[in-house]
């Protein structure tokens, strides 16, 4: 991780709430930004911020998220998500996030990500897959 990753670093992402990001269970007129989609977009914004400061052999994974989804956002509305680094503790990074649509604030969140070495992570995943195979074999 580069020394440039410090508290105060920010990233803003703008997107349009498309059909895939909405709920469907309230009919066509009830299509609004789904909470799971909002969480995914928040995680993506934080990940992009980290990648701006990561070495080429690094990636990040989510550890924890807390979200207050404050207001509905209609299909085809514009959303702006802003994430900022609050703390860096070794490879663990804490973010605060705000999101707003064209009319009002829609969410506040905190999110923690962990910076990982890609090659080491792949080895851990291979080891877990081998254990899974052994467990399934009985």
Task: Report residues per predicted region.
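Hydrophobic beta-strand-centered segment that forms part of the acyl-chain substrate-binding groove
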Residues: 47-80
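Generic structural detector for well-ordered beta-strands
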Residues: 3, 12-18, 68, 84, ...
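Catalytic strand-loop segment that frames the active site of acyl-thioester-processing enzymes
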Residues: 1-33
């Amino acid at each position: 991780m580069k020394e440039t990753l410090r508290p105060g670093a920010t990233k803003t992402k703008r997107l349009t709430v498309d059909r895939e990001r909405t709920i469907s269970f309230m009919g066509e007129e009830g299509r609004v930004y789904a909470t799971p989609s909002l969480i995914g977009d928040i995680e993506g914004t934080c990940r992009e911020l980290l990648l701006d400061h990561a070495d080429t052999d690094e990636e990040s994974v989510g550890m924890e998220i807390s979200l207050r989804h404050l207001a509905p956002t209609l299909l085809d509305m514009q959303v702006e998500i802003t994430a900022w680094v609050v703390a860096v503790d070794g490879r663990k990074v804490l973010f605060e996030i705000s999101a707003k649509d064209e009319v009002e604030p829609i969410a506040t969140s905190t999110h923690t990500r962990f910076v990982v070495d890609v090659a080491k992570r792949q080895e851990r995943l291979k080891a877990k897959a081998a254990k899974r195979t052994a467990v399934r074999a009985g």
